[in-house]
Amino acid sequence: MNAVAPLPLPADAADMFDLPRPAAESRIVVAMSGGVDSSVVAALAHASGAEVIGITLQLYDYGAATGRKGACCAGDDIQDARAVADRLGIAHYVFDHESAFREDVVEQFADDYLSGRTPVPCIRCNMGPKFTDLLRMARELGADCLATGHYVRRVAGEHGPELHRALDPARDQSYFLYGTTETQLDFLRFPLGDLPKTAVRELAEAAGLRNAAKPDSQDICFVPDGDYAKIVKTMRPEGGTPGDIVHAQTGEVLGQHKGIVHYTVGQRRGLEIGGQPEPLYVVGLDAAASRVKVGPKRLLAVQAASVIETNRIGPLPDVPLTAKVRSLAKPVPITLDGSLGDGATTRITFEQPEFGVAPGQAGVIYAGDRVIGGGWIDSTESAA
């Protein structure tokens, strides 16, 4: 095996991990998913001179989840992670977390869809297996920190570490990490937060990693084909119960649907209710009655939202705040009414009506680039 060449780094590798002691005396645990991002983090950690241990969680078997045989995407990712660890000459451990992942993430995903909500399972995964469990393992292994391939920044603040958006807005993943606690953030490191994706792939090539050109994942990991309804109906057959499609304003029955799991708030395609005088969108889901409510786009305008089970990272600053209700949305100005953090319920009011806000999504609050916290959207108030 050829030695790993020195990496073309913009800074000293050890400085990218903010280690509490000299790198030669430190131990870094890296969460390795098998993708190029976490693999480059492992290469950076190795280049720092610290002892490096890679950990991969086996979270799901796609074949079992969908009823298809011999389709275990997770297994391929584990092999990629192991190959990278071998290339770098670092220890690598795989832990079976399928049962916990199914209970904490996949089952909740199915239940949310069944209740008419729009789930964000990646956030629940970060709150559970990825951070809670990995952090515990890293500490048990005597690590000085746990490093991940997330595109966010950990910035030293007046009151301790702060979570900030990545410098590359196209890669920023801060929306998914609002649930990080202050204690967790103190131990976590995100060395990719200052880098564009192009630089990360160049580093992977320089290190000779076999997954340097591996495509980015585009879908939820346990739904790689993007067919959410299929996996929900496999787990919850009642999700395929048909029902009425009704006009939210007139109450008129416009057609029939094949199960509310096929629909989310804001959806327009797939309604199969042609001949209407104006375009209609899904504006609400009545799970108890198995009813899909549709209406004109103006009914999707939301003025405020109730956000539950909130988390706060550090003190709340006395500055203008913004919020995101979808990962790819731009933060928009808001006002906050109520406590934020410790599981409290708060209310966010949008300066301008916001579209596409649905129960089950996360409402993530920012002060500039800093993530203040957030919670789950429980209900909305129409601006129409």
UniProtKB/Swiss-Prot annotation:
Its main location: cytoplasm. It is found in: Cytoplasm. Coiled coil: none annotated. InterPro entries: MnmA-like, MnmA-like_C, MnmA-like_central, MnmA-like_central_sf, Rossmann-like_a/b/a_fold. Pfam families: tRNA_Me_trans (PF03054), tRNA_Me_trans_C (PF20258), tRNA_Me_trans_M (PF20259). One of its GO terms (biological process) is tRNA wobble position uridine thiolation. One of its GO terms (molecular function) is tRNA binding. Residues 171-173 are annotated as: Interaction with tRNA. Signal peptide: none annotated. It catalyses: S-sulfanyl-L-cysteinyl-[protein] + uridine(34) in tRNA + AH2 + ATP = 2-thiouridine(34) in tRNA + L-cysteinyl-[protein] + A + AMP + diphosphate + H(+). It comes from the Bacteria. Keywords: ATP-binding, Cytoplasm, Disulfide bond, Nucleotide-binding, RNA-binding, Transferase, tRNA processing, tRNA-binding. The active site is at 125 (nucleophile), 221 (cysteine persulfide intermediate). ATP binds at residues 31-38, 57, 149. Its EC number is 2.8.1.13. One of its GO terms (cellular component) is cytoplasm. Belongs to the MnmA/TRMU family. Catalyzes the 2-thiolation of uridine at the wobble position (U34) of tRNA, leading to the formation of s(2)U34. This is tRNA-specific 2-thiouridylase MnmA.
